[in-house]
């Protein structure tokens, strides 16, 4: 019922604040960024990016997953939406946004017995996209008994995995090489509002203010 009351409030009051904007969006959209995030209710793309309607093209699924090219048929709607945003809508930026306390990432540390898989077969099948992270985690045994650090590491490895999966598609890789598309990997910390951006050169996640400074200094933002 809360959603209905909220919709009524929007319709009768909040819409008026953006009336001209919505009217301008009646027959066209020109978002500058494709934002791929988890379905988690605590991740609100327009809120954390300070954007208005029409600025973001949003794709959401459990774990902000992009299927690798070798498995694209297992999540055709996701990659088809990515292709549409890039090839037809013409976005110039693409952000993969992971987040803290991610249930999808946390699930790879749990034991998935056959009973659990039988109860939630679709979830079990989807989580298989995150399997490569398990191998990478073996390189960081120091975090195996530290829940918080292991969680952050898993979430960041996942964001990096999805960036690599994106680049397995020719139509994305070509645009990145030709500087027609910029791709970013974010890790959003829910309880603090902090966002960390993946640095492709250092292979570390850095506070976004550092990324902004670097890109402004290189006039590449």
UniProtKB/Swiss-Prot annotation:
Cofactors (names): Zn(2+)
Keyword Endoplasmic reticulum on entry: no
Enzyme Commission (EC) number: 4.2.1.1
InterPro entries: Beta_CA_cladeB, Carbonic_anhydrase, Carbonic_anhydrase_CS, Carbonic_anhydrase_sf
Catalytic EC class: lyase
Catalytic activity: hydrogencarbonate + H(+) = CO2 + H2O
Molecular function in Gene Ontology: carbonate dehydratase activity; zinc ion binding
Chain residues that bind Zn(2+): 38, 40, 99, 102
GO biological process, one term: carbon utilization
CDD domains, A to Z: beta_CA_cladeB
Bilayer-spanning residue ranges: none
Name of this chain's protein: Carbonic anhydrase
Taxon lineage: Bacteria, Pseudomonadati, Campylobacterota, Epsilonproteobacteria, Campylobacterales
């Amino acid at each position: 019922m809360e959603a209905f009351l909220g919709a009524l409030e929007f319709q009768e009051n909040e819409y008026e604040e953006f009336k001209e904007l919505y009217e301008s969006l009646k027959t066209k959209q020109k978002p500058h960024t494709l934002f791929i995030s988890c379905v988690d209710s605590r991740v609100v793309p327009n809120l954390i990016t300070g954007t208005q309607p029409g600025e973001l093209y949003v794709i959401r699924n459990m774990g902000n997953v992009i299927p690798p090219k070798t498995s694209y048929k297992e999540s055709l709607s996701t990659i088809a939406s990515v292709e549409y945003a890039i090839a037809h809508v013409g976005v110039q930026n693409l952000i993969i946004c992971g987040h803290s306390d991610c249930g999808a990432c946390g699930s790879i540390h749990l034991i998935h017995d056959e009973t659990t898989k039988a109860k939630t077969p679709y979830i079990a099948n989807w989580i298989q996209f995150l399997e490569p992270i398990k191998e990478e985690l073996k390189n960081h045994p120091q975090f195996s008994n530290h829940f918080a650090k292991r969680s952050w590491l898993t979430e960041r490895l996942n964001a990096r995995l999805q960036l690599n999966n994106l680049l397995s598609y020719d139509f994305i890789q070509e645009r990145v090489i030709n500087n027609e598309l910029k791709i970013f990997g974010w890790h959003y910390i829910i309880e603090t509002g902090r966002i960390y951006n993946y640095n492709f050169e250092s292979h570390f996640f850095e506070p976004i203010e550092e990324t902004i400074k670097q890109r402004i200094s290189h006039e590449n933002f």
